Curated annotation (Swiss-Prot):
This is Glutamyl-tRNA(Gln) amidotransferase subunit C, mitochondrial. It catalyses: L-glutamyl-tRNA(Gln) + L-glutamine + ATP + H2O = L-glutaminyl-tRNA(Gln) + L-glutamate + ADP + phosphate + H(+). Allows the formation of correctly charged Gln-tRNA(Gln) through the transamidation of misacylated Glu-tRNA(Gln) in the mitochondria. The reaction takes place in the presence of glutamine and ATP through an activated gamma-phospho-Glu-tRNA(Gln). One of its GO terms (cellular component) is glutamyl-tRNA(Gln) amidotransferase complex. One of its GO terms (molecular function) is ATP binding. It is an enzyme of class 6 (ligase). It comes from the Eukaryota. It holds the Pfam family GatC. Keywords: ATP-binding, Ligase, Mitochondrion, Nucleotide-binding, Protein biosynthesis. The lineage of its organism: Eukaryota, Metazoa, Ecdysozoa, Arthropoda, Hexapoda.
Amino acid sequence: MLQISARFYCKIAKQQISELPKISKPSKLLDFKQLHHPTKVPQTPVPTAFPDATNNSEIEIDAKTIQLLERLSLVDLDSEQALATLKSSIQFADKIEHIDTHNVRPLYTVLEHQQLQLRNDRVAEGDCREQLLRIAKVTDEDYYVSPPGNIPLEQLDK
């Protein structure tokens, strides 16, 4: 009985496939090589011109500021490459700070065509600081203490 019904369905499927319209022109198919942007992510960096409201002079960072940044970020900034990266990041931040965003609405999600349901900003469960601090292995002044990065926490004289 099972073989008969399976064969019956195969015959129906074969008839339906034969009744489908034939694609006569394969040129109507989408050719991804002809698209300017086949994906939403560009394959190469896209150069963007920023308004040049600031001067492009070299940024000078004193040793005390570098020590403070090393202590806060737990990243060693001794190499020239690390300092160059830090300076270029500061210059980039300075450039984007001068971009006019007066008439630009805030972006809550990167999906521009979908609504993002925002919840009310209120405390649902609160006053559990002591309970959360008991879970931590190491605390200092009611803060979690994380393991250090690539430099010791003690300050070294440079």
